[in-house]
Amino acid sequence: MSAQQPSAQPAQQAPATTQAPTTESSSSNSNGNTPAPSTSTTATSQSSDDSLICRWNQCSERFPSAEALYDHICERHVGRKSTNNLNLTCHWNSCRTTTVKRDHITSHIRVHVPLKPHKCDFCGKSFKRPQDLKKHVKTHADDSVLARSPQDPNANLGPGAYRGHASKAPSSYYDHNGHVRTNSSAFGQPHHHQNGHASYYSHPPAPYGGGMYYQPPHMGPRGDIFGHPGAGAYDSRKRGYDDLNDFFGNLKRRQFDASSYAHVGRSLVPLHGALSVHTGGVGGMAAEYMAAPPPSSSVSMGSAGPLAQHYYLPPMPSLRTKNDLEQIDQILEHMQSTVYENSGSSPGAHYGSGSGYDMRHQSPVGIRPPMSDHYGQQQHSPMTAVSSSHGGSPAVTPPSSNLSYTSGHSPGASSAALSPSSRQGSSISYPTLPAAAGSSATAQLGSNFSSVERRLSGGILQSASRDRERESSYDGASTPRGPESVGSPSACSDASGSEPESYDSWVQNMRTIEALRDLVRERLRRGQYDDVEESVNLPPIKTERPDEEKPLYPSLRMS
């Protein structure tokens, strides 16, 4: 048995030795059956090698990469102005393109060199110049607007919120040909990308742990970052804040007369649109501007978006100390009294006497008729009265039964529609015309004043008419009024020659001054001022010097 075992082992090794040549022969057969590389691959590699040859005149130098070829052309053939070898004409084959700057010629060389460093993040296509990539990205934006489906959850992001995709990713929004894929389920995750590439425009992080595509109910159809009006509102409020600071600075420097109604009106005009008195006053302008998030609802994914942004306004230099606030409050009180005293001049002096109606009271000021019979009798105009609103500012009330609308005193559509008999009962001073026989004017409801059909008094100068009206106002008023103070000759000319302020402007001025005083008083109440007062510059003290004794003889100075 022991003798048979050694003989069996060589028998078992024999097939193994016989199999080795067969494997070698098979491998040799497989190597022999491998097809040769195709001619198309060889042609492609040859064409790529030919594109890396410099064709500038007779250079014909070969380079390993497109970057090396581009650097060679820019440094060797184009040159630089500093080295005095700048060439602005392209000599690639027969191009002969001439430019005016070195940047232009280097950008033009990219057309000939197969260098495409600018790659599209959506489809992976490369471009030679950045302007070509920019035009290509616009085509993606147009396709996303035209081909977006109604069920697309990203529809509210607008055309500017692009997604990031790879050139070969199966879940990309665009395929290699630029067509939109139907698999839109892969775009529900906004913060990571399966292909590992970043998006062209990065998405903001979702605040408060909410969903990315949650749309607040009070916003428009655009996305959260595009529909947020915080920055534009802050700019407008900043402009109003600057106007308010300039106004307070002019008050401190006394650049206009607070006792002149014309000066006060002109100084308040820039603040009418900036203060927004009708929509909340100036309280919000003094404090910080904060866009608050919408109220929480029962929806679990509802988030406030990026609305929780704070915009802090800079400190107001003109209202820095307590002394500034008290001084400006006194000036505003003086301005308010000036506007309040000039309330009777609002309804236009060209249409009647400028002081025939006092807008501060319910009852008009009685004025006796003038001495002459050639002028109509003075009577109050049917202007509405002024009452105080909840905010302390005057408001307009509906017209009451101040006039009995009879056939003799019915207001016409304009001053031209009044009959001679009714003109005596109106507030317009015209010469009395002879009564025409026939029917009187039809009773209508309308205004007694017409801004278009303005007429001047005939037979008398305007200056004499104003003097007569002023005398009549002094004689008829229960309390004689003092002469209107004018701060400067320019203000006198403005008050006499220009059109008087309308009733709406007077009300707006009153509301503006009241809102400014509320702002100043609120700052004083809250203590929003610096405790350190400004150093007061005292005038220099004059001291008398003793008279020096004059010498008996004049002294000669040696030069």
From Swiss-Prot:
It comes from the Eukaryota. A zinc finger (C2H2-type) spans 52-77, 88-112, 118-140. Residues 1-47, 181-202, 339-430, 459-505, 527-559 are annotated as: Disordered. GO terms for molecular function: DNA binding; zinc ion binding. Activated by C-terminal proteolytic cleavage by signaling protease (probably palB/RIM13) at neutral to alkaline ambient pH. GO terms for biological process: positive regulation of transcription by RNA polymerase II. Its main location: cytoplasm. A motif (YPX[LI] motif 1) lies at residues 430-433. Residues 375-391, 487-496 have a biased composition (Polar residues). Residues 542-551 have a biased composition (Basic and acidic residues). Keywords: Activator, Cytoplasm, DNA-binding, Metal-binding, Nucleus, Repeat, Repressor, Transcription, Transcription regulation, Zinc, Zinc-finger. Residues 407-427 have a biased composition (Low complexity). A motif (YPX[LI] motif 2) lies at residues 553-556. InterPro entries: pacC/RIM101, Znf_C2H2_sf, Znf_C2H2_type. One of its GO terms (cellular component) is nucleus. SUPFAM superfamilies: beta-beta-alpha zinc fingers (SSF57667). Transcription factor that mediates regulation of both acid- and alkaline-expressed genes in response to ambient pH. At alkaline ambient pH, activates transcription of alkaline-expressed genes (including RIM101 itself) and represses transcription of acid-expressed genes. Binds to DNA. Interacts with RIM20, which binds to the two YPX[LI] motifs and is required for proteolytic processing. Belongs to the pacC/RIM101 family. This is pH-response transcription factor pacC/RIM101. It comes from Pyricularia oryzae (strain 70-15 / ATCC MYA-4617 / FGSC 8958) (Rice blast fungus). The gene is RIM101.
